[in-house]
Amino acid sequence: MSLDLTRQRLESAKERINRYIDQNLLLWATEEILLPGQTDIAGSISQRASEALSLEKSGFMKVDLKWDFRSEEGAPIHFFLEYGTRPHRIEAKGREHGGADALHWTGPSGESRFAKVVQHPGTEGKNVIATIKEERTPALRERIIKETQNHMEVDSI
């Protein structure tokens, strides 16, 4: 067998493996990254926040983890939770603007608190997406290796 023919066969096998990975990557990433990530978010934030986590096919053999968790008014809560917020002032909208005349929240000891204006101290970012990717990507790599090896064994029979 000539060297050129051997190279062609190896290239063909490599292309088939890459195509196999690309065709199955979204399923594997869903099982290894998305579902466990949603469970983590549901436990640490809320079920509604976990439902806003998704995977998107972003190219050949590529997927991106997306989180688009928004308030009823459309505010990007996912961004505030992921990266944190600076200290900021919060004012009641007032009834004439479709809101309430006072802000309401539950204090640390469970009592109801009210104010027209508060100076919020800001929040530290939780790095939810970064943490999920860091913790779950090794499992996806292992899954790709295992599935590819199984596919190659079946394909060679």
Regions found by a protein language model. Give the residues of each.
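Short, Lys/Arg-rich flexible segments
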Residues: M1-G74, H97, D101-I157
